[in-house]
Each structure stands twice: as C-alpha cells, then as structure tokens.
Amino acid sequence: MTPKQYKYKAFISYSHQDKKWGDWLHRALETYRVPKGLVGKETGAGVVPKRLFPIFRDREELPTSHELGRVINKALDDSSHLIVICSPRSAKSQWVNEEIKQFKRLGKSDNILCLIVDGEPNASDKPGLEEEECFPEAAKYEIGEDGELSTIRTEPIAADAREGKDGKRNALLK
C-alpha cells in the first residue's frame, strides 16, 4: 500500500508566547537539507525528500478567517507529523492541547514529536512542581474510543533543546 501523500511535512503547534521558538523551528526545518545519502531512499513513510518543505505554522499559513477551527483541523489532516514546542506555556494552552487531541483522533499518534524548550517533563506528577510542567495533557495520554483523552499514559517522543540537554542543534537533528 502506498503511504498517504501529505500537503505538509509537519504542523508546528506552540503557544504564541513561544513565538521565537516557532519562528526558529519553522525556518530551520524548511531550510534543512537532507543528507544526499538518504535522499530518494524508500522508507515506510515513503521516499526521503531533499527538503522538509512545506511546514505548516499558523502565523505563516493561516488567512484571516472566522473559521479558524476548520482551517486548523484541515491543516492537521494534511500534515504528516505534528511537532509540539513544549514549555509551561504550551502545557497550559487550550489550543495546543486541542491540536494534539485532533492529531491523535486522526490516528497519527505515532507521528507526534515534542521539542522541549523550557520547563520539566512530567513535573505535574511531582507535588510543588506542577507549574514547571512542559508537556500538554494531551501529549501524555492516549485517546480513547470516544475521541477524548483516556487514563492510559503514554511517553511522548521528545528532543530537548534546553541548555545542558541536547541543545538547539542536536534537538533539531533528532
């Protein structure tokens, strides 16, 4: 079976308070050149392209529209991967949480990648550190048959761009 062809290589989900990270990631991904030895190789996700283009980011892609929810849902459906910029701000963002839930409802849970830029993973499990949580709730739980978050925990796939961790460059390569 031929893998689905997507309009976007990825959809970047982030809190607008993390706009500088969204700008950086969008630019870095769209200008990234895939190593020549990988280009053209057949994988389970299709043929490896020369560039990771286009990437959906709301400020870049969205027209001024009163039907924002419909446009966002269409873009999520048209995206191969969802990249979530994780920080205490995104962990509290209703929009980021909804985008993750919708992507999971589309059956693409395995294609969610997290980029930690601030805060602590799973801090909400530690009394007194709840405000430092960087993962949105929807990133930490599976979607149930009813389309809502279940009580079954999942471990997000994450690169860590924080200083002293992977750093920006290594996190991008991951």
What are these regions (language model features)?
Residues 82-83:
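Hydrophobic acceptor-binding patch used for acceptor engagement in glycosyltransferases
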